[in-house]
Curated annotation (Swiss-Prot):
Membrane topology: Multi-pass membrane protein
Lineage: Bacteria, Pseudomonadati, Thermodesulfobacteriota, Desulfovibrionia, Desulfovibrionales
Pfam families: CRCB
Keywords: Cell inner membrane, Cell membrane, Ion channel, Ion transport, Membrane, Metal-binding, Sodium, Transmembrane, Transmembrane helix, Transport
Signal sequence, renumbered to the chain: none
Chain ranges passing through the membrane: 4-24, 35-55, 67-87, 100-120
UniProt record similarity statement: Belongs to the fluoride channel Fluc/FEX (TC 1.A.43) family.
Location of the protein in the cell: Cell inner membrane
Name by which UniProt lists this protein: Fluoride-specific ion channel FluC
Positions that bind Na(+): 75, 78
Activity regulation statement: Na(+) is not transported, but it plays an essential structural role and its presence is essential for fluoride channel function.
C-alpha cells in the first residue's frame, strides 16, 4: 500500500509542476508554438536522465524514492521522458529496429490516435 502513496504524492507534485512550468513558459514566449509542452518534455528528459545517472547508476536510489521521483513525479510531469529513456535503453542494447519502431510507432500512431479520437468525439456529440 505504501508504494501507491509514494506514486500518488509524486504524481500530485508532478502534475502541479507540469501545469505551472507549461503555463509560465507559454505566457513568457507568447507564441502559437506549444513551447510550454515542449519545455516540459525537454526538462523532463533532462531531469529523468540526471536522476537516473546520479542515483540509480552511482549512488543507489531506494525503491521508494524511485517510485516517488521517477514513477510518480516524472510520470505526471511528462511521459515523454519515459518514452525517450526506454528508446535509449533499446539503443544501448543494440536493438535499432525496435528503437525505430518505438519512436516512429509512438509518434505516428499517437498522432493518428489523437486525430481519430477527435473525430470520434465530434461524431458522438453531433
Amino acid at each position: 500500500m505504501h508504494k501507491y502513496l509514494y506514486i500518488a504524492a509524486g504524481g500530485a507534485a508532478g502534475s502541479l509542476c507540469r501545469y505551472l512550468v507549461s503555463g509560465v513558459t507559454q505566457r513568457m514566449f507568447a507564441t502559437s508554438f506549444p513551447i510550454g509542452t515542449f519545455s516540459v518534455n525537454m526538462i523532463g528528459c533532462l531531469f529523468f536522465g540526471l536522476v537516473t545517472g546520479l542515483f540509480e547508476e552511482r549512488l543507489g536510489l531506494p525503491p521508494e524514492m524511485r517510485l516517488l521521483i521517477l514513477t510518480g513525479f516524472m510520470g505526471a510531469f511528462t511521459t515523454f521522458s519515459t518514452y525517450m529513456f526506454e528508446s535509449t535503453n533499446l539503443i544501448k542494447s543494440g536493438q535499432w529496429a525496435m528503437t525505430a519502431l518505438n519512436i516512429g510507432g509512438q509518434s505516428i500512431l499517437g498522432f493518428a490516435c489523437i486525430v481519430g479520437g477527435l473525430a470520434l468525439g465530434r461524431l458522438i456529440v453531433s
